[in-house]
Amino acid sequence: MLLEYIDEVYKSVEKIKATQIKNIQEAAMLIANSLLKEEDSVFHVFGCGHSHMAAEELFYRAGGLACVNPILPSELMLHEGALKSSYYERNEDIIKLIFDRYDLRQGECIIIVSHSGRNGAPIEAAIEAKRRGLKVVAITSKEYKQKTFSRHSSGKFLEDITDIVIDNCGHYGDAVLKIKKDTLEISFSPLSTVLNTIILNMIEAEIVSIMIKKNLVPPVFLSGNIEGADEHNLKLIEKYKKRVKHL
């Protein structure tokens, strides 16, 4: 089954290449332009449950941009209680309290990652972000809207609210492999984290490319395990530490 999983990854990545490049390029351009407005401009990344790893993937990353502000509320992560995180992911009322902890500025961009796009917290995050004047990019699976209902009081899905939607080309239920034997039928091996991570790094790669074309030096962290990295990285940390809460 291990090779079948890789094959499923390839299938979805090829679908992303075939259908989502324009959306990814538009998202990168939107974010890049927002970063040029102020010397300390950042963009924000938010996700619930396992989707919070999207924010961690881009944050303080070797080869990644320093101007990334991850929104990492423990209530919506797994390490302080998986059941609690599932409860709060469906709760739209918590978002304003969470956003008040972070420096979110009008004209900046936020990437919201939700595989299902149906739960209260990520949908409310998009609504609240737009209310505060941010542009919203969503990474989600469009299959869910075709097969289930929204859990937000508005009845809307994440893709209905955002400025740019990127379909991660993942599947309803996330698991992509199946075994059926006698009366036993199991679906297993999720794809969403792999696909979301690929898309996020595609966005960052395009942002860096846009900055270089504008004769700017992208604020990219070096790996802490190569010589000279500490001095380079500390300069970037000094520049963004007032904007990036978790630095």
UniProtKB/Swiss-Prot annotation:
For this protein, the record's InterPro entries field holds: RpiR-like_SIS, SIS_dom, SIS_dom_sf, SIS_GmhA/DiaA_subfam, UPF0309
State one Pfam family annotation: SIS_2
Instruction: Give any single GO term for biological process.
Output: carbohydrate derivative metabolic process
The record's GO molecular-function terms, alphabetically, read:
carbohydrate derivative binding
Q: List the disulfide bonds.
A: none
Highest taxon of the lineage: Bacteria
Q: Where is the SIS domain?
A: 31-213
User: Which HAMAP family does its entry note?
Assistant: UPF0309 (MF_01240)
**What does the similarity note say?**
Belongs to the UPF0309 family.
Xref: NCBIfam families? PRK02947.1
In Swiss-Prot or TrEMBL terms, this protein is called UPF0309 protein Teth514_0240
| Species assigned in the record | Thermoanaerobacter sp. (strain X514)
Q: What is the lineage of its organism?
A: Bacteria, Bacillati, Bacillota, Clostridia, Thermoanaerobacterales
